[in-house]
Structure formats: structure tokens, C-alpha cells
Regions:
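Short, conserved non-catalytic motifs in the polymerase core
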Residues: 1-11, 26-39, 101-123
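Short glycine-rich, polar/acidic loop-and-turn segments at beta strand-coil junctions
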Residues: 5-6, 16, 69
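Short acidic (Asp/Glu) patches
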Residues: 37-52
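Conserved polymerase palm-domain catalytic core
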Residues: 48-146, 150-165
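Short helix/loop capping segments that flank catalytic or ligand/cofactor-binding pockets
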Residues: 10, 23, 74-77
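Short secondary-structure capping/junction motifs at helix and strand boundaries
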Residues: 21-30, 56-60
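Active/ligand-binding-proximal structured segments within catalytic/core domains
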Residues: 10, 14-18
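A generic secondary-structure signal for well-formed alpha-helical elements
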Residues: 17-26, 85-93
Length: 165
């Protein structure tokens, strides 16, 4: 069911004025989806940058798995999505409205595609993963576009460990 015009206007204002500025602050540079100044072209450019840097340091020895989180939007639990938003928002009214929007998708699992709120929510859900890969696992060459990501590393075991998480 399509969102009504007045609801779409409210969601757009909520995203542009509250959610986007607060939530994207913690995003890594190489999270390339649904953000001002980023997109598919940026993701491709960042991929080229990472491949060049890796190649200059390591040559062609290494691994580059391209990964997709299967059924990402359809299988995101609402509790996880709401927690990811609340963790990053200071405005509790905006958090409550966002919770209602997430719950409007019905059931306890699944975030609808296409909504601006859905996109920013799903980016926030994987923000902790981005930081874990970059900071804890120290995988320097990592690029993500929504639920697709690429890791570049010389140690296959390190990558297999990362992919099991």
C-alpha cells in the first residue's frame, strides 16, 4: 500500500531535518548509499581507490569477496531497527515517530523498500558492522552500498572469520 502524500511529506521532513543529520554523523566514509554526495558512482570510485592502494602495497596477492546480505530489508527485525535509530537520535519525539513508521510495515520483521525512512534506518542498522570491520577487525579496505559490501585483504582466514560474523 502506497504512503499517503501528507505522510510522505512528514517523513521527508523528518528525514531531512532530524534523522539524516543525526544518524549519518557516525557513518564511515565508505558507507556510500543514500547520502548527500554519495551513491553508486561514489561507491565505484571508492572501490577503485581501495583496489589501487591495496595493489600498490600488496600486488595481486589477496582476496576480494563481494557480499550481499540476503533479504536484508525483508528480514530486519523491528526491534533491531528501532534500537539502531534510538542509539543515534537525541530527539525522543523523532525516535517515537520513527518507531511508528517502522511498526507500520506490519509484523515484527521486515522494513518496506522505497521509503526514505527505511533507507536511513537500514543504513543505521549496519553502521555498527561497518565500525566493527574497520576498527576491530582492522580491515582497511571495505566499501558498503546498502546491503552489498566488498572486503579486500591478503589473508583469506581473516576474511572468512569476518564473513562468519
Amino acid at each position: 500500500v502506497a504512503t499517503r502524500i501528507k505522510d510522505r511529506q512528514f517523513q521527508r521532513s523528518l528525514c531531512d531535518n532530524v534523522l539524516y543529520p543525526q544518524i549519518t554523523r557516525s557513518f564511515i566514509r565508505d558507507n556510500c548509499a543514500c547520502q548527500c554526495g554519495k551513491g553508486v558512482d561514489d561507491a565505484l570510485n571508492r572501490m577503485n581507490v581501495h583496489l589501487r592502494r591495496y595493489f600498490l602495497k600488496n600486488g595481486s596477492n589477496g582476496w576480494v569477496p563481494k557480499c550481499d546480505i540476503r533479504h536484508y530489508f525483508a528480514e530486519t527485525p523491528h526491534t533491531v531497527a528501532k534500537a539502531a535509530i534510538r542509539k543515534r537520535l537525541t530527539d525522543q519525539d523523532a525516535a517515537a515517530y520513527t518507531d511508528m513508521i517502522i511498526d507500520s510495515f506490519g509484523g515484527e520483521v521486515g522494513i518496506g523498500l522505497g521509503s526514505q525512512v527505511s533507507q536511513i534506518t537500514e543504513l543505521a542498522v549496519l553502521d555498527d558492522l561497518d565500525h566493527f570491520i574497520k576498527e576491530r577487525l582492522r580491515i582497511k579496505h571495505y566499501i558498503r552500498y546498502m546491503d552489498d559490501f566488498v572486503l579486500i585483504h591478503n589473508d583469506k582466514d581473516v576474511l572468512q572469520t569476518a564473513l562468519k560474523l
